[in-house]
A protein has these predicted regions:
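Ferredoxin-type iron-sulfur electron-transfer modules and their immediate structural context
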Residues: 1-109, 114-115, 122-177
Length: 177
């Protein structure tokens, strides 16, 4: 496991309900908690987790903004960056919207072990799938799917690929729109 010793010796015991086994000497002297430790707290508590339908997405970012656990992330990347990050044919992307993102791909990835299944992302999603007649349906770009072992195994490599993608150059983002 890649987790730091503090996470293994203290945080993990607390999460497992074994806090009484933590030695006083293992606790920080000044009471401060190390930063970035939540990245190791994969609880998988949701019965259902959100999934993304790229073709229905309008790339507004509401889902990422409203997610209380920060497990819905968005990125824009070049096809080359996607290849370098290890994206395969199952990694979902769609052409990015906006002239500043010409020839780039947009992706949303959900960290399924962090999702609590609250459905806030689905309720704020304005993106709708289109039916055979070309009209919008009630099906949204984000939807809930049962959090099975198969789903977790399918999505884990996608999350790893997503994290390997570079962050978008902030100069490309027009904050005035």
């Amino acid at each position: 496991d890649e987790a730091p010793d503090f996470v293994k010796q203290v945080t993990a015991k607390m999460m497992e309900g074994r806090g009484e086994q933590i030695k006083v000497s293992e606790m920080p002297d000044d009471g401060r908690w190390p930063t970035a430790t939540t990245q190791w707290e994969k609880r998988n508590i949701a019965v259902q987790v959100s999934q993304w339908e790229p073709e229905a997405c309008i790339q507004c970012g509401r889902c990422s903004l409203v997610c209380p656990h920060g497990c819905i992330r968005m990125k824009v990347a070049t096809p080359e960056a996607l290849r370098e990050a290890g994206a395969d044919s199952t990694f979902k992307t769609v052409d990015a919207i906006g002239k500043e993102f010409k020839d780039m791909k947009f992706t949303i990835q959900v960290s399924t072990p962090d999702c609590c299944g609250c459905t806030l992302c689905v309720s704020v999603c304005p993106g709708r799938k289109k039916g055979a007649d070309g009209k919008k349906t009630e099906e949204r770009a984000l939807f809930m799917e049962t959090n099975t072992q198969e789903l977790r195994e399918r999505e884990a490599p996608h999350w790893k690929t997503f994290l390997a993608l570079p962050e978008v150059d902030e100069k490309l983002i027009n904050v005035g729109t």
